[in-house]
């Protein structure tokens, strides 16, 4: 951990060194090309000194030139406005978390209120999913093209003794080469015993395009370490004390927890390179044909580790060790993809690709039990082949993509088809089908732990999880935003309690049918606004394996105005979140996974926030009073069984853009 801390400090020092150096050039100056002829003699000076001409300050380039490019080459521009959507994204994840319920401390996990089954992987993915909410994947890294250096600082206060800062810097070294460097760090002690969080996400990315435009390169390096102290939740007596609303327990540190000697860390590094080359020069706009060859390299090395000084045998069962328990799971994943893409104005775009993946998942030793032998590794090679098609025609867009494993120990395929239509400037409609078959996550197939009950090998017994869905989406600022998805899952893999009361992996042969409808509308009345988002969910079959709240809603009433001769923009109002009661998933710290429980119903507690936000130039300032109603409402709010939700808290922060 000392090495991680040292590396983190060095990276922060490097970043701020890069940040400070360009500050000397904030005022760009332009001198006359004929300086000698335009100098002016100062006749009042006995030394006949030469006074330089008055220097001109360059105007900042238009905001439209500051471009953000996704890995899929979708381009947006830097947005410094203060909207209600910006308020929703002002959180630790930097994205709208309407479908999630956070735990009490910043940087802990989230319980999922609204589910998403749109995954397109054809091979297993790493477990410890409860720790991956802030783990940045390939699609979370963006690339930039900016006319002048750009810096963004994000800050938000946390829950006692710490801070959350996300610092970002990008610049173009030339018209065709850009790099960016960023670091997001968090430390928060929390209000309850032993829930400190300490996380870091370092990103470095660059993109390049050759002078003739035929070669394009995107690449990034990401290093992430996400550490959480674990306490197992409140004890039974502490839960009673919490619900009693006794003032002596308003200091949450007085509430006893199940243990105070455990911590877990998710650590990962990734190297990513995405490059393509045009075989046919695009010098003539009449040229309708384009052939590109490309290569994508993605190497990731990650591990999850759970450490505990004294095993909590009363909660997790007997242990092979009596002290200093350490469970570590590693994954090395090395993927190479080569593709050929043909584009034609009449026919559309057709892509063929071949993937090779080397994977090595597991542990250092084999476990021999009375019930059998549990191996230490899942290791091998996978080869997959696929194709995709895309065509635009008079407002319509057709897209299709298919991929299947053709060699290796894991079978799997993915098929996605979508049609969309842009109705002038009124609305965008899309609909499609998605079919996927892939192995369950690695920690369902193989898991080893010092806790005797947390050892299993299911790779030979589990079938592929098969998911099929029909989706519809409409986006319209004039009407409303709406989406609907009907999902059917067979051979669904999940975690739940076994007959002995310990968490284990299960796979059901029953169908799980899930319907989700989500609607959003932002209505304006002069300077007032009302933004409503409602999600409806139901599980028509398989309700014992997938529990969801029937209704999740967020309603925000707000007022906006310009003050002080339009030098200050103000946004103030209240935000109301609510979800119906249901059998909420419970959290297991050993696995860092949520598991199904059907005994305790949680929900139907409102969450009311008050906010007063401001924008001055390129700075957005936020003042948020979170969960105000907890001051007068009963203590019946939980993020998971045994884990209370946040109490009333005042939060402050800002997002500041510098255009240097």
Named regions from a protein language model:
Residues 8-13, 255, 313-314:
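Terminal non-domain segments
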Residues 22, 178, 349:
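Exposed beta-strand and adjacent loop surfaces of beta-rich binding modules
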Residues 313-325:
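A solvent-exposed, charged loop/short amphipathic helix patch at secondary-structure junctions
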Residues 1-10, 26, 181:
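Positively charged n-region of N-terminal signal peptides that target proteins for export
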Residues 16-24:
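Hydrophobic h-region of N-terminal signal peptides that target proteins for export
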Residues 26-266, 280-288, 420-426, 642-648, ...:
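Membrane-proximal, glycine/serine-rich, low-complexity loop/turn segments characteristic
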Residues 235, 243-247, 317, 370-375:
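Solvent-exposed loop segments that connect transmembrane elements
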Residues 10, 15, 146-148, 265-308, ...:
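Exposed, low-structure sequence patches enriched in small/polar residues
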């Amino acid at each position: 951990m000392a090495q991680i801390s040292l590396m983190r400090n060095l990276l922060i020092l490097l970043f701020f060194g890069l940040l400070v150096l360009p500050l000397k050039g904030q005022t760009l100056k332009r001198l006359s090309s004929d300086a000698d002829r335009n100098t002016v003699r100062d006749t009042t000076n006995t030394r006949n000194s030469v006074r330089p001409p008055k220097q001109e300050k360059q105007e900042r380039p238009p905001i439209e030139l500051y471009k953000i490019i996704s890995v899929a080459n979708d381009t947006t521009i830097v947005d410094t406005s203060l909207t209600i959507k910006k308020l929703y994204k002002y959180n630790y994840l930097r994205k709208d978390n309407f479908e999630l319920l956070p735990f009490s401390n910043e940087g802990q996990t989230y319980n999922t209120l609204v589910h998403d089954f749109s995954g397109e992987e054809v091979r297993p993915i790493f477990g410890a999913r409860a720790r991956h909410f802030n783990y940045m994947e390939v699609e979370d890294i963006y690339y930039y093209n900016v006319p002048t250096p750009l810096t963004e600082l994000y800050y938000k206060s946390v829950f006692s003794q710490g801070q959350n800062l996300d610092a970002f810097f990008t610049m173009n070294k030339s018209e065709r080469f850009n790099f960016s460097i960023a670091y997001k760090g968090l430390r928060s002690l929390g209000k309850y015993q032993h829930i400190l969080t300490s996380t870091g996400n370092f990103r470095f990315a660059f993109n390049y395009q050759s002078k003739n435009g035929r070669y394009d390169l995107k690449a990034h390096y990401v290093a992430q370490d996400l550490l959480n102290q674990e306490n197992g939740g409140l004890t039974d007596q502490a839960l009673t004390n919490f619900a009693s609303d006794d003032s002596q327990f308003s200091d949450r540190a007085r509430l006893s927890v199940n243990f105070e000697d455990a911590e877990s860390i998710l650590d990962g590094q990734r190297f990513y390179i995405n490059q393509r080359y045009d075989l046919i020069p695009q010098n003539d706009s009449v040229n309708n044909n384009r052939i590109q060859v490309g290569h994508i390299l993605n190497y990731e090395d990650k591990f999850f580790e759970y450490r505990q000084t004294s095993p909590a045998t009363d909660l997790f069962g007997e242990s092979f060790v009596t002290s200093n328990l350490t469970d570590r799971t590693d994954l090395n994943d090395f993927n190479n993809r080569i593709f050929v893409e043909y584009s034609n104005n009449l026919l559309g775009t057709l892509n063929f690709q071949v993937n090779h993946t080397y994977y090595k998942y597991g542990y250092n030793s084999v476990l021999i039990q009375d019930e059998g032998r549990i191996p230490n590794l899942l290791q091998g090679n996978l080869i997959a082949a696929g194709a995709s098609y895309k065509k635009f025609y008079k407002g319509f867009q057709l897209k299709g993509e298919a991929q299947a494993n053709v060699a290796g120990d894991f079978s799997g395929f993915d098929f996605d088809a979508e049609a969309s239509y842009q109705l002038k400037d009124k609305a965008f409609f899309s609909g499609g089908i998605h079919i996927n078959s892939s192995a369950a996550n690695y920690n369902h197939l193989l898991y080893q732990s010092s806790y005797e009950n947390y050892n299993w090998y299911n790779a030979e017994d589990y079938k592929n999880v098969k998911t099929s869905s029909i989706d519809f989406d409409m986006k319209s600022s004039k009407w409303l935003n709406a989406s609907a998805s009907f999902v059917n899952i067979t051979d669904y893999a999940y975690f739940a309690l076994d007959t002995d009361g310990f968490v284990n992996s299960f796979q059901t042969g029953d169908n799980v049918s899930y319907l989700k409808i989500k609607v959003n509308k932002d209505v304006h009345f002069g300077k007032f606004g009302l933004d409503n988002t409602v999600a409806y969910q139901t599980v028509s079959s398989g309700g014992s394996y997938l529990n969801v709240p029937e209704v999740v809603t967020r309603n925000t009433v707000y007022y906006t105005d310009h003050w002080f001769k339009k030098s200050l923009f103000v946004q103030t109002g209240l935000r109301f979140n609510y979800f119906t009661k249901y059998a909420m998933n419970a959290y297991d710290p050993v696995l860092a996974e949520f598991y199904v429980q059907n005994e305790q119903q949680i929900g139907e507690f409102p969450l009311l926030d008050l906010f007063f936000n401001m924008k001055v130039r390129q700075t957005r300032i936020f003042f948020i009073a979170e969960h105000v109603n907890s001051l007068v409402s009963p203590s019946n709010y939980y993020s998971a069984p045994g884990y209370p939700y946040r109490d009333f808290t005042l939060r402050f922060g800002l997002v500041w853009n510098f255009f240097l």
